[in-house]
Design a protein with these regions (language model features):
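N-terminal flexible/basic segments that precede or flank functional cores
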Residues: 1-22
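Charge-rich, solvent-exposed alpha-helical interaction surfaces
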Residues: 6-10, 33, 84, 88
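Short, amphipathic alpha-helical "recognition" segments used to contact nucleic acids or chromatin
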Residues: 20-42
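Short alpha-helical "recognition helix" segments of helix-turn-helix
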Residues: 42-52
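Recognition helix of helix-turn-helix/homeodomain-like DNA-binding domains
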Residues: 52-76
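DNA major-groove recognition helix of helix-turn-helix/homeodomain DNA-binding modules
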Residues: 73-94
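Helix-turn-helix/homeodomain-like alpha-helical modules used for DNA recognition
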Residues: 94-165
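Long, low-complexity, charge-rich intrinsically disordered regions
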Residues: 156-182
């Protein structure tokens, strides 16, 4: 795992999305996502508009079980509808995750990294090592690349932040890299 992947793995574990565990294809997962959308958009009308379906379609998706008159299963969204629903709900969950992440990144404590670290172009005698980078550090610059999923930029941004903290250029190499903070 390179520095970008290690940083992303730590951030994903530290700031979970809050998305329901149940898949959107299950009644439970679908209703949970619909509830989140209705809460965020002020009711069924706003939620249906955000997903891009009519209010009537939204109402039918809400129903579960079987129709009492016909005994047939109620209408559920197809693949395209589920993609729309999951995408719109995902934005809601990512926004909440973003708020938590930005607050946590502003006051990261006990920042550590493990890997082959070049300080100003030089390797230490024992190249693979764990370094306590800082007791407290502002890592808000990591948020943008993490949100975009840009691993290369995320790794470079982390290296630059650590370099600023130590007034030195650093480069983390190798595939056995770890990053952590509290």
């Amino acid at each position: 795992m390179n520095i970008g992947e290690a940083t992303q793995a730590h951030m994903d574990a530290r700031y979970p999305s809050g998305e329901p565990i149940s898949a959107a294809t299950t009644d439970r997962g679908r209703i949970a996502r619909m509830n989140a959308l209705e809460k965020a958009h002020g009711g069924p009308r706003g939620a249906a508009s955000a997903v891009g379906v009519s209010r009537e379609t939204w109402r039918r998706w809400r129903l579960t079980g079987r129709d009492p008159r016909t005994g047939k299963p109620r209408q559920k969204p197809g693949a395209a509808g589920l993609n729309k629903l999951a995408g719109a709900a995902g934005q809601i969950y990512r926004a909440a995750q973003a708020r938590r992440a930005q607050q946590g990144l502003a006051r990261a404590r006990g920042v550590r990294m493990t890997g082959i670290i070049r300080w100003d172009g030089y390797l230490n005698k024992i190249p693979q090592r764990t370094v306590r980078v800082a007791d407290q550090m502002d890592l808000t610059s990591l948020y943008g690349p993490w949100e975009r999923g840009d691993l290369l930029a995320l790794g470079e941004t982390f290296e630059a932040a650590v370099g600023r903290e130590h007034s030195a250029s650093i480069q983390v190499e190798g595939d056995e890299t770890e990053v952590s903070w509290t």
